From Swiss-Prot:
HAMAP family: CCA_bact_type1, CCA_bact_type2
Protein's recorded name: Multifunctional CCA protein
Lineage: Bacteria, Pseudomonadati, Pseudomonadota, Gammaproteobacteria, Vibrionales
Keyword vocabulary terms for this entry: ATP-binding, Hydrolase, Magnesium, Metal-binding, Multifunctional enzyme, Nickel, Nucleotide-binding, Nucleotidyltransferase, RNA repair, RNA-binding, Transferase, tRNA processing
Catalytic activity: a tRNA precursor + 2 CTP + ATP = a tRNA with a 3' CCA end + 3 diphosphate; a tRNA with a 3' CCA end + 2 CTP + ATP = a tRNA with a 3' CCACCA end + 3 diphosphate
Residues the entry annotates as binding ATP: G8, R11, R91, R137, R140
Domain HD: 228-329
GO biological process, one term: tRNA 3'-terminal CCA addition
UniProt keyword annotation of Metal-binding present: yes
Keyword Magnesium among record annotations: yes
Residues annotated to bind Mg(2+): D21, D23
Gene source species: Photobacterium profundum (strain SS9)
Gene Ontology terms, MF aspect: ATP binding; CCA tRNA nucleotidyltransferase activity; cyclic-nucleotide phosphodiesterase activity; magnesium ion binding; phosphatase activity; tRNA binding
Length: 411
């Protein structure tokens, strides 16, 4: 019975990155032997055990054979005669197929270290095509390691394209698609996840609402990049630079879905995209079972972002109306979410990446002033019911006017 550290822990250590989780592989053991040593079995599909003290995962070496469509159609074989090399062969990428012995010696039968040195994401074997989830995983790894200069091997991209054409991705469940997308939102370059999916044709399958933006023109006067899809990728990049918050990053990626629905006769204008975008956002979130906080923030940004772009000339009462609409009094975090997404939107344009965005400062100043208005004096003055709400709006509008006037004069 031999134990090896495998997968991401070995890879990240070799890259000089922080190792978060450690996964172990056990060769030459049976489930009975593991249980006898105090390990707790947790895997139902294949033998995985938790260490009695560290609670880290220990999996018995196994092989996998395709038995059906999708990512669940596998027959797993786990026995003491399965070798280390056989287990590593079933893994997706060479950089994830390196094992380490307790003394630190590396076992690297598929040249993962060489690919790490050359910054290449390359599949281990032709069996890569048997699991459609790997298309999304490679896209996510590409997003995670893009800042280090990693690229995908041409032959791996070719396999991913073949899998898309073969219809393999249609077997993916909504939960698995969302899980990979959500993980990509935590990477250094979330826009690369979408770029890779677009490159291999998968974006049209798993996120057709985003894919539909590519090729749709915008006015060159405001959008030198012209293409709505390119703009979306640029906004996604800007949002990632502005905030680590996954909800904000998601909202930025889907805020312009309505532009794909603009009438062709109106192009390159998109006058109704803020309203038109609500339906595809709802459809996308329902299909992929996106959590409600992601969905609601995305809908808010979609509905309001064009208004905020005109904050320089917006009337105080309009600010108060918007703050009411987004439920900012109960959910103050929405104001900063909206401000950051709008800043990302404004900067997600060719040549405007470093523009100042005073509109965000005006919005935040308006909210800060309105929030400080106390309702108690209004109630004490004898107002009741709807009259309280009306008076509160009047007082908030007056406070907002004082707060934003100096900022608007700078615009």
């Amino acid at each position: 019975m031999q134990t090896y550290l495998v997968g991401g822990a070995v890879r990240d250590a070799l890259l000089g990155l922080k190792v978060v989780d450690k996964d172990w592989m056990v060769v030459g053991a049976t489930p009975e032997q593991m249980l006898a040593q105090g390990y707790e079995q947790v895997g139902s599909d294949f033998p995985v055990f938790l260490h009695p003290k560290t609670k880290q995962e220990y999996a018995l070496a196994r092989t996998e054979r395709k038995s059906g469509k999708g990512y669940t159609g596998f027959i797993c074989y786990s026995a003491p005669d399965v070798t280390l090399e056989q287990d590593l062969m079933r893994r997706d990428l060479t950089i994830n197929a390196i094992a380490q012995e307790k003394d630190g010696r590396l076992i690297d039968p598929y040249n993962g270290q060489q690919d790490l040195d050359n910054k290449i994401l390359r599949h281990v074997s032709p069996a890569f095509v048997e699991d459609p989830l790997r298309v999304l995983r490679v896209a996510r790894f590409s997003a995670r390691f893009a800042h280090l200069g990693f690229t995908i091997a041409p032959e791996t991209i070719a396999l991913m394209q073949e899998m898309v054409v073969a219809g393999e991705l249609e077997a993916l469940t909504p939960e698995r698609v969302w899980k990979e997308w959500e993980k990509s939102l935590s990477t250094e370059n979330p826009e690369v996840f979408l770029t890779v999916l677009r490159q291999c044709g998968a974006l049209k399958v798993v996120m057709p609402e985003i894919d539909a933006l590519f090729g749709v023109p915008q006015p060159a006067q405001w959008h030198p990049e012209i293409d709505c899809g390119i703009h979306t990728l640029m906004v996604a990049k800007q949002a990632a630079e502005l905030s680590p918050n996954k909800v904000i990053r998601f909202a930025a990626q889907v805020h312009d879905l309505g532009k794909a629905l603009s009438p062709k006769d109106d192009l390159p204008s998109h006058k109704m995209h803020c309203k038109d975008g609500l339906k595809p956002i709802k459809a996308l979130c329902q299909r992929l079972r996106v959590p409600n906080d992601y969905r609601d923030t995305a809908l808010m940004v979609c509905a309001q972002h064009t208004k905020i772009h005109h904050a320089n000339e917006m009337r105080p009462a309009t600010f108060v109306n918007i703050l009411d609409q987004i439920d900012s009094w109960r959910k103050p975090e929405r104001v900063i979410q909206l401000a950051l997404c709008c800043r990302a939107d404004a900067r997600g344009r060719t040549g405007h990446e470093n523009d100042a965005y005073l509109q965000a400062d005006i919005l935040l100043a308006a909210f800060d002033a309105a929030q400080q208005v106390d309702v108690k004096p209004i109630v004490a003055a004898g107002f009741k019911g709807k009259d309280i709400k009306e008076q509160l709006a009047i007082h908030r509008t007056a406070a907002v006017e004082l707060a934003i006037k100096p900022l608007q004069s700078k615009a």
